[in-house]
Amino acid sequence: VAEQYFLGTETSERYPLWTRANVGEVFPDPVAMSSFDFAFCNADGIRMSELGWRDAYARIGAFTEDEFDPDNTVILGVFGGYAYLNASVMRIFGERAPGLSAAAIDAQFFGAQPGIPDYEPHPDDASPEAEARIGATFGWVLTTDGLPEVLADEEMVDALRADRPDFGAMGDLELLDWAEQILDEHFRHLFSQHLFVTSLATLPAGIVTDVCAALGRPQDALKLLAGLGDVASAAPSLVMWDLGRRVAAGDSLVEAFDVGLDGLEDRLRALDDEGARGFLEAFDAFLYAYGCRGPNEWETSCPTWETEPNLALAAIDRMRLSPESADPVGRQTGMAVERERLGTEMVGMLAADPETQGQFGAALGSAGIFMPGRERTKTNCIKLVHEARMAYLEFGRRMVEQGVFPEVTSFAMVTFAEGRDLLEDPTGWREVIEERQAVFDEVRELQEPFVIVGDPPPLSTWPRRDAIQVDPVGVGESIQGVPGCPGVSQGRARVILDSHDPTDLEPGDVLVAPLTDPSWTPLFVPAAGVVVDVGAPLSHAIIVSRELGIPCVVSAIDATKRIPDGALVEVNGETGVVTVLEV
């Protein structure tokens, strides 16, 4: 094992607790050099993601700039190659925020965290000034009727896509300059918007959860946060469903899909009947609108639906086999109707306490703004990253042709400055890239610590993922996770470790997955239920599951290793319990 990864950040004495929770879902692999350079830090200092998060906390009023190290990242760290969130900072936000707590932040964002220590107050954690500032912001959260800035950002990134230049006509240096320019101009702002809205979404979610618990109806909290509508990250699944219906209705399309995923896009584009032409027109429109989504989509070197359309076709392939009863629009409508019914009922139950009644009603309305807003702000970031990705891929193709890069995606192994250097003199860069890639590949096979307190353990002590042994769940035994989306379902467990190849998942199966970034969420539609190793109620994919109405349990630790593939299981999305019924 390599003695150390080729990049990383410092730990923090003031904020010593780091976690893979939440960030591990969106950065499952080690961080590549190019992402570290623009998002974390480089020779010039702290970079866009850290700065954007600090901007968000300052805007909320939770922290002042002098509470953070000016020279080192504090909120986002990279240890042993893996991205970590600083749980100490997020817990302090919870403690300072009126009506929240460190425990509430843990529950909403992190779910079950094996090995995480209890919150211990630091003398500087309490801040009456910060509490007052946050309180004023919270007042706005509960009264605003929309997020117009977020919609303006959406228009901006959509315009970038519409005005995408002809990368093939640009020079090598122009490609690098263009990608760096759009990231430098926009990413800090977009990421700050994302964390601003994300942090504030904890308020309505927390109020709804607390009031439901006080009324003796804790199981209804998730139902009141479901069926919100206008969730950007759920939209692709709805369009894919329609595409799947087109396939199911077209004989030539069915035949093309039945052959298998290999070469599927080429077979489809060779068809010339009316149904096939209609499908391809709709599919191309889908790729234009949602082509930025994919596995590990924050990382520019990873594939997306535009760069590898078969990733999207694989999910459509599963949906085409589903019965009409699996229509996500119908499920979403049902969740929305139930949300309205429950909301009216519970507001009525609070008639004797007008203050709480008013706050609860405001929280229900606010949840409908800030939880979809969280997904839209993330989507705005991903759209921007994707435009940079497309420029990088053109650059990578050219460097492969010139013999500088071993792979098109080798751009991920160099910084902006190094990219310019190798254009001036490519001598030796291929060897440097291959050495870094070898370390990246080696570290990707290691199981990183879920929680770090203080300094991270050396890489030499991290076990290989394939060497970790756990006991399988037997008949009648259960795994206790965290409720993600209400509902109870049964089905055969299908352990799918890679969203690139979901062909074992049949309609009515229970999807058991290690994580669920947006490339996984379309697979929720044909599934009877979803079980995930990690996650929490405010995880991105869990918000999507509540829009699609799929019973879901998250933070079911080691479920992909412990639940036998093919076992009949029951998923209880209200209690968070997954039970093996037979094997």
Predicted regions and their residues:
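Residue-level detector of short coil/turn "hinge" positions at structural boundaries
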Residues: Q219, G294, P406-E407, C552
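Extended, domain-scale alpha-helical bundle/helix-rich regions
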Residues: A362-P456
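N-terminal, non-catalytic alpha-helical interaction modules of very large eukaryotic scaffold proteins
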Residues: A2-P372, E387
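Acidic, glycine-rich flexible loop/linker segments
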Residues: V1-S12, L17, A21, R494-D509, ...
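Protease-associated
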Residues: Q4, T9-S12, A159-A162, A169, ...
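Glycine-centered helix-boundary capping/hinge motifs
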Residues: G216, G403-V404, G549
